[in-house]
Amino acid sequence: MNKIKCSLVLLPVLVLLLNSCASVPAEIDASYHEEVFFKNAQEAMDANQYNVALYYYEVYLVRYPENHDKTIAAEYEKALIYYKTKDYDYSKALFEQVLDRYENSPFAIMFPERYKILSEKILLQIDEKLNPKKKNK
């Protein structure tokens, strides 16, 4: 079951990476400190190079799965990228996974509360976008 979830999460990321205009680094230096990933990802997001930002977050998640407070940050940022690119269905699924980690992870006590709060707020916005209320005339 987890392999299926993982595949469903990684497949759109791979498609986005392969189809995007900005090129991602062919290789990331093995000596990069954890903070470099977030710095580079944020710079890419500021430049609207979402595929590059996703790449840095994905590599971070593979290299540093034991740093739980930063892992939840990377997962949140990935969801935010899909929200910004208007892939509301997929971003909704990712934000729900972030919230699920707060509920079910044994490491949830280490997670900064802000990602939970922000995920809940953005999920409400996504629901409004996916299910717009009809205005009475």
Language-model segments: residues:
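Sec-dependent bacterial lipoprotein signal peptides
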Residues: 1-23
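Acidic, polar-rich low-complexity tracts and alpha-helical solenoid repeat scaffolds
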Residues: 21-137
